[in-house]
Amino acid sequence: YGRRRHPKKLTPLAYKQFIPNVAEKTLGASGRYEGKITRNSERFKELTPNYNPDIIFKDEENTVMNQWPGVKLRVTEGWDEDGHHFEESLHYEGRAVDITTSDRDKSKYGTLSRLAVEAGF
């Protein structure tokens, strides 16, 4: 009690590495598939939109900013309805998100993935 944990060294995730080490749609990673959410469904009302053009992503801990000053987290895909994902994709339920950095520097993606895991995604 009362002691701060020392920050652990974050190791970047490897390309195609998952945490937990299972695919996105397995029970251990995300729970049961609950069904696609459409604009006309009741569950659509439960999704939280973000219309502010000045906000790229809520990052209360400023983890991306602390790691790379001046760089923001960029959400490229969240809830989706266009049908280009696999049939039971969590994007259709609003439970999956694709992210990158505002500078689109691919060398940061491994560390970005680790930050997402540490944040509970």
UniProtKB/Swiss-Prot annotation:
Residues that coordinate or bind Zn(2+): H91, D98
Pfam families cross-referenced by the UniProt entry: HH_signal (PF01085)
GO cellular component, one term: extracellular space
Keyword Cell membrane assigned: yes
Subunit-structure text: N-product is active as a multimer.
Family: Belongs to the hedgehog family.
Protein name: Sonic hedgehog protein
Organism field: Puntigrus tetrazona
